[in-house]
């Protein structure tokens, strides 16, 4: 076999072999979009497009589909002005729901142009969704997808997100696909509070020991749930127009205090001060009750 024929055979063969994501380009920062992370050819994750210039940039780069996994309503008007379509697949910080994974699979199978996936800031949910999408399309192996999440700064504290990627399997051919919608009706405050109620019910059982032993014996699981509580407060605070303008400052201050209280609980657990963590949790519950009395129960 002469060298020319051998070279052509090798080139053709290599095109059929899975090509890994180039990890040499560790981080891409684009002027109009934060957390610009590639998950293979034609698939990128990042933060929420902040306005017209960001949508114009995406359109200019050949993107036609944007997937939002954030809870907030996408900016459909700006996207449409630049010929972009949205798919809204809201997801939480505790893992990728099967319906969201199927939605990502359908997007990647249908799209014949680059896809941009975003959450709010581009660190956690967006890269996780992009990791799932990259495996669904065959752009990344599981190992490569996880490496991309690390590059994006996805926190190890969100163990449910990492588990979702590690356990992802392609759907069976007969699996019904979900309807893809540009915007899913929702309320960040209500959704966050439902999640917080569920998490606190679990924590309440561990808080029944006066010396904090319940937190100590379930350390990792408790810390994971406190992280979810912190993110729940952050999401709830983003819901606009839930209080009168005259109460807005007090509303925001209460959420900031609650987030600070959770950080103190987490630090107490890192320092293995279980009784202090338990006391902090009880104080957090007291703050929640006071807020409910003023804004929910009146």
Task: Go through each PLM region and give its residues.
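N-terminal low-complexity, Pro/Thr/Ser-rich intrinsically disordered segments
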Residues: 17-35
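Sequence context surrounding c-type heme c attachment/ligation sites in exported
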Residues: 143, 147, 151, 182-298
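Bacterial Sec-dependent signal peptides at the C-terminal "C-region" and cleavage site
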Residues: 5-22
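Sec/Tat-exported extracytoplasmic proteins
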Residues: 47, 59-62, 70, 108-112, ...
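Cysteine-based protein phosphatase catalytic domain of the PTP/DSP
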Residues: 41-113, 137
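PTP/DSP superfamily signal
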Residues: 16-21, 105, 109-113, 135-211, ...
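A phosphate-binding catalytic loop at a beta-strand-loop-alpha-helix junction
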Residues: 114-131
